[in-house]
From Swiss-Prot:
This is Movement protein. It is found in: Host cell junction, Host plasmodesma; Host cytoplasm. Keywords: Host cell junction, Host cytoplasm. GO terms for cellular component: host cell cytoplasm; host cell plasmodesma. Coiled coil: none annotated. Transports viral genome to neighboring plant cells directly through plasmosdesmata, without any budding. The movement protein allows efficient cell to cell propagation, by bypassing the host cell wall barrier. Its main location: host cell.
């Protein structure tokens, strides 16, 4: 998904370049030049909850009493004010003359509009009001602006799924006394956390809170990285205006997968400083050689007290680090090799559970389960007739067998967002490719595991059917039926709803 669809690209003051001081030094003439120029680019994530509110209440947005009853006085007033501004022909966007971007002075200062004091009163301290108008225009397709809220919802739920399955478990070892990180690491549990909204009645609110956290981390990281790109442009002999506009053109060409955003958010969250996080993100996104890979792998690796030294494969183009966690080995690798899913890599590291693709490099996460003392390990799996059978588990088949059930639930929760809330299920033809690509990003291990002797496992077979939606007419009707059944439960993910979903998956035929 491209940057403009995921975010609002706005103009801010020179205070955004403050992070460059920590990276390049306070005395850097180029950094001082940028701060004095006082124009920067800031990425602001779309508030998915607000987008859905605008869309779901489109007919009542001018009804102040009704909006206040539904969303409280503060939010209700904000919604109505945004709607009335969007309809006011006299309402003018404050636009940066240098970049043509919407002005939002999150960083304070007056550099973007120093020639007119009236803009100070309009912008400073009221950025949220301006952003609300812009998001409303997108949600209601006003002035040619539009977003596909269904696809954006699915995209962010996919990001949430990847983050909580791949990265959250690592945070248990890094939490220390930080309640914030502990809450992130346990985001799938059914309990309240100070990090998330207090007024939630089910875990759908918890998911939305996590989406807010992830989108904020991503936006902060991308804004900082953009600043380093502007500085680089300036070192190439361009003036400030050219540098900003060159970076803006580049920024609008960027596309992101959910796995990329999850990794960037993780780096921003766990790095000791914002400056170090920015350097790491830049190194991963721009690397054309493996020279920096060992240092980056240390940051990306699964964290525990048994981390092994970073090693290089014989070719020198792949750096990796393995971590033993009980009877499970987690391996994180950075490679320039495009054939990353080769049997050689799987035999060495285990099941490839996550792939993050950058321009030149690939970040890979593997899991290898080792049966205790070499004994044969079995798990109990239901068949479609609800007769339970024992399945022999090998190191390579263990991850697919253990995680297939939850993966089916995550797939359904992700893609139900794309379909109408009522009426018949109609999937647009162009959505099949979108669904397939997003699912491959979430579950790369499914395709790589189909060669194993586990296709008779019921949950794994259901997951394979879901991932082949639209490609196999025999399975299409069954998956469609499952999606329809899930609609009532997917937004109310209580214990009862989860039980209903598990029952539906178990009896899936």
């Amino acid at each position: 998904m491209d940057t403009e669809t995921l975010c609002l690209i706005t103009a801010d003051s020179g205070k955004v370049y403050g992070i460059l001081k920590a990276i390049f030094g306070d005395e850097s003439e180029i950094v001082k030049k940028l701060i004095d120029f006082d124009v920067s680019i800031r990425v602001v994530p779309l508030n998915l909850g607000l987008l859905n509110i605008f869309r779901d209440n489109a007919a009542d947005l001018d009804n102040a009493d009704l909006m206040k009853r539904r969303f409280g006085n503060t939010m209700g007033s904000r919604i109505v004010e945004a709607y009335r501004r969007s309809q006011d022909s006299k309402y003018k966007r404050n636009v940066c003359k240098t970049t043509g971007l919407l002005v939002c002075l999150f960083g304070g200062g007056l550099g973007l509009s120093r020639e007119a004091d009236k803009h100070k009163k309009f912008v400073e301290g009221k950025s949220h009001n301006i952003l609300s108008v812009e998001m409303l225009k997108r949600a209601l397709s006003i002035g040619g602006q539009n977003v596909d809220a269904n696809k954006i919802s699915s995209f962010w739920f996919a990001t949430y799924t990847i983050f909580t399955t791949v990265y959250s478990p690592r945070l248990r070892y890094q939490a220390g006394s930080s309640k914030r990180i502990i809450a992130l690491s346990e985001s799938r549990n059914q309990y309240r956390s100070n990090l998330f909204w207090d007024l939630r009645d089910d875990s759908s609110h918890e998911v939305m809170s996590m989406v807010h956290v992830l989108s904020a981390l991503f936006a902060s990281a991308l804004t900082a990285y953009i600043s380093t790109r502007v500085r680089h442009e300036l070192t190439q002999g361009n003036d400030e205006r050219e540098s900003l506009n060159n970076v803006l053109v580049w920024l609008k060409t960027l596309t992101f997968e959910p796995s990329t955003i999850a990794l960037i958010a993780y780096i921003w969250l766990v790095s000791p400083t914002d400056a170090q996080a920015t350097i790491t993100i830049g190194s991963v996104m721009e690397s054309e050689s493996s020279d920096d890979f060992p240092d980056i792998v240390k940051i990306l690796s699964y964290t525990s007290n048994t981390m092994l030294p970073v090693q290089l494969l014989e070719d020198g183009r792949t750096a990796y680090c393995s971590v033993a966690d009980g009877y499970t080995r987690h391996t994180t690798a950075l490679t320039l090799i495009t054939d990353y899913n080769s049997s050689h890599m799987s035999d060495k590291f285990g099941v490839l559970i996550n792939i993050v693709k950058f321009e030149h490099a690939y970040a890979l996460h593997y899991v290898h389960h080792k049966p205790r003392d070499g004994k044969e390990m079995t798990i109990t799996s239901p068949s479609s007739e609800m007769m339970f059978t024992s399945v022999v588990v090998t190191p390579l088949s263990s991850y697919p067998l253990i995680h297939a059930r939850n993966a089916v639930i995550d797939w359904l929760r992700t893609f139900v967002h794309m379909f109408p809330d009522s009426g018949s299920l109609v999937i647009p033809a162009d959505s099949y490719t979108w669904i397939h690509n997003l699912a491959q990003d979430m579950f790369p291990w499914v395709q790589l595991s189909t060669t194993l002797d586990i296709r008779d496992d019921h949950y794994f077979q259901v997951l394979c059917d879901c991932l082949s939606l639209g490609r196999d007419s025999r399975n299409h009707a069954k998956v469609e039926k499952l999606i329809k059944y899930m609609k009532a439960s997917v937004y109310n993910f209580t214990s009862e709803a989860r039980g209903n979903m598990l029952l539906a998956i178990t009896v899936y035929k």
